[in-house]
Amino acid sequence: MKKIQFLKVGDYMKTITRTKYLDRIIELNGTPDIKIITGIRRSGKSKLMQAYIEYLKSNFENINIIFIDFMDLAYEEIKEYHALHAYVEEHYQEGKTNYLFVDEVQMCPKFELAINSLYSKGKYDIYVTGSNAFLLSADLATLFTGRYIEIHVFPFSFQEYCQYYDDISDKDKLFDEYAIKGGLAGSYAYRTEKDRTNYIKEVYETIVTRDLVQKYALPDTLVLQRLSEFLMDLSLIHISEPTRHSLI
């Protein structure tokens, strides 16, 4: 029987520094724009925001970080745009550089009214994350009246996959593994292919059958599912042998 090492909750998965994205956010530090971090579910938006917060704490003094995570029940009472606005204003600190971070901002109905009002005051450096299904690039200009910059986060690239496993000894073998496992790093926590596949399937179904259907009130989910499957098959056709090493 194979011996299994049990890990504490929170220790089951390693993290890597996603330098490309972190460097981009650092470049935008202090600019007069709303920084909007978008991407599909489980692509690493929240982890990126947390990494940036840690960077600020380690490199700057006299700062005030206002952090709101709408996935956390502790912030349930401010999932209303007036309450969100009031909460941020209450936590503002005069004489400091005030950073505002709102994770999963779309969970607060009419959030854009609060964010636009806070932006207009000119006293916050604002960062928000949101799912692609609710913060499409085409919608951002309508939602935000002030200047904004979008940072779009993708699942792990092949290069990041190699970095995660700290191995570039056999690129062909690693690419074959990557083609099966994909770039959703949350699936790497599971030991069996079945569990990894179930994780990816659940993320896919949440995006297609819940997020998109809910946003656009689509009556026929079967057509949407078939279309998404066709697009996935089409993308695989374009991953050819010459593509392998160019991805690292």
Explain the meaning of each model-derived region.
Residues K2-T15, P155, Q159-S240, R244:
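Interdomain hinge/linker elements that couple catalytic modules in large macromolecular machines
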Residues I37:
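Hydrophobic anchor at the beta1->P-loop junction of P-loop NTPases
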Residues K45:
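Conserved lysine of the Walker
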Residues L48:
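Hydrophobic positions on the alpha1 helix immediately C-terminal to the Walker A/P-loop
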Residues I68-G95:
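Short glycine-rich substrate-engagement loop in P-loop NTPases that contacts/grips substrate
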